[in-house]
């Protein structure tokens, strides 16, 4: 439906469709939310592991999404809870998104005190210099060059391949496996006799 109004001798045409679209809440964004002007606000929350969070503007507008890539600071970029910032934002299909975030006076942000937890297993390897299971290799060993010795018993009169303790531990494991085999064969014989 089309409405015609006369203003100062000029014809002004409006359609009912445009009047309903102006009532749409998505189109009622204030000019400060749409422009790239500098706004002040606080960090509502920020997930340091995922690298994003939300800002609450001081002027009471809609919350603004912030990604770590737009935060101005060196090193690990994050925001502390309730940290005061100044930011620029733009409207996207998902809502308001920050395009630049800095400290209140335009400098680097302070950032969060938390760091994401890294699920990294420590790799334990044997240092062939000191013989310890540690997180270093022989070229990085703090003890310096050591004399050749057995890494199993630390004896300096022989090497690991010729260690007398190696045979003792092998004979114990062999005797255990032999006794396990004999007991399992005896159990099989008893079950066969019962049937």
From Swiss-Prot:
Q: Where are the zinc fingers (CCHC-type)?
A: 126-143, 148-165
Offer one example of a GO biological process linked to this entry.
post-embryonic digestive tract morphogenesis
Tell me where in or outside the cell this protein is found.
Cytoplasm
Composition bias, Low complexity: 170-188
Q: Which SUPFAM superfamilies match?
A: Nucleic acid-binding proteins, Retrovirus zinc finger-like domains
This protein's UniProt keywords? Cytoplasm, Metal-binding, Repeat, Zinc, Zinc-finger
- Which GO CC annotations does the UniProt entry carry? cytoplasm; cytoplasmic stress granule; cytosol; nucleus
Query: Which InterPro entries does this chain map to?
Result: CSD (IPR011129), CSP_DNA-bd (IPR002059), Lin-28_RNA-binding (IPR051373), NA-bd_OB-fold (IPR012340), Znf_CCHC (IPR001878), Znf_CCHC_sf (IPR036875)
Name the domain of life.
Eukaryota
Segments forming domain CSD: 38-104
Pfam families in alphabetical order: CSD
The UniProt record gives the binding positions of Zn(2+) 1 as 127, 130, 136, 141
* MF GO annotations: mRNA 3'-UTR binding; mRNA binding; zinc ion binding
Q: Which residues bind Zn(2+) 2?
A: 150, 153, 158, 163
Region (Disordered) location: 1-31, 164-195
The family assignment reads: Belongs to the lin-28 family.
**Protein name stated in the entry:** Protein lin-28 homolog
**Origin organism of this chain?**
Drosophila melanogaster
Its gene is lin-28
């Amino acid at each position: 439906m089309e409405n015609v109004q006369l203003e100062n001798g000029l014809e002004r045409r409006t359609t009912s469709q445009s009047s309903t679209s102006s009532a749409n809440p998505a189109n009622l964004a204030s000019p400060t939310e749409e422009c790239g002007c500098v706004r002040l606000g606080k960090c509502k929350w920020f997930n340091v592991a995922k690298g994003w969070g939300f800002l609450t503007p001081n002027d009471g507008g809609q919350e603004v999404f912030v990604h770590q890539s737009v935060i101005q600071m060196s090193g690990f970029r994050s925001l502390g809870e309730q940290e005061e910032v100044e930011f620029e934002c733009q409207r996207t299909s998902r809502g308001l998104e920050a395009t630049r975030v800095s400290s209140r006076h335009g400098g680097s942000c302070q950032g969060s005190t938390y760091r994401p937890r890294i699920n990294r297993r420590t790799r334990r390897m044997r240092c062939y210099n000191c013989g310890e299971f540690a997180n270093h290799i022989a070229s990085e060993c703090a003890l310096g060059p050591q004399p050749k010795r057995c890494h199993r018993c630390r004896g300096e009169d022989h090497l690991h391949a010729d260690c007398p303790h190696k045979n003792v531990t092998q004979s114990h494991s062999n005797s255990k496996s032999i006794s396990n085999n004999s007991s399992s064969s005896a159990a099989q014989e008893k079950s066969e006799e019962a049937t």
